């Protein structure tokens, strides 16, 4: 669950930002997110459906002055889920599944907004 991940070049990255409803905390959504992520990992991992790896991120409030251009120093979301897939089509098939929908709907009840945007990896590397 907390192991390093390896992302092959050419994988599709889906970046899902989540804004929680007022009064909802990270602790409130932790179980729902864990169950949803387990459905994806267990049912669609590797040859079963193209899921490669994923990460759940919490915005922690620190902002890089060196890497930021505009005046905004905040985020419009609380959490991000980054998943990596062999293809966008495999991602969409997994998320159309009834079992995934059941788990996602529990999380959605606690969210004010969620956007899932797709990216292609242009560069990646490790420290030498």
Protein language model features and the residues they cover:
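Short, composition-biased linear "edge" segments at structural boundaries
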Residues: 107-108
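Short S/T/G/P-rich N-terminal loop/turn motif that feeds into the first structured element of a domain
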Residues: 1-101, 112-128
């Amino acid at each position: 669950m907390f192991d390093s991940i390896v992302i092959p070049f050419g994988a599709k990255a889906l970046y899902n930002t989540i804004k929680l409803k007022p009064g909802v905390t990270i602790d409130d959504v932790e179980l729902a997110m864990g169950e949803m992520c387990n459905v994806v990992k267990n049912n669609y991992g590797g040859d079963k459906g193209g899921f490669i790896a994923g990460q759940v991120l919490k915005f922690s409030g620190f902002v890089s002055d060196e890497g930021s251009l505009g005046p905004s120093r905040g985020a419009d979301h609380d959490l991000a889920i980054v998943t990596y897939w062999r293809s966008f089509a495999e991602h969409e098939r997994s998320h159309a599944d009834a079992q995934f929908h059941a788990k996602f709907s529990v999380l959605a009840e606690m969210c004010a907004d969620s956007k899932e945007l797709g990216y292609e990896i242009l560069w990646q590397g490790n420290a030498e």
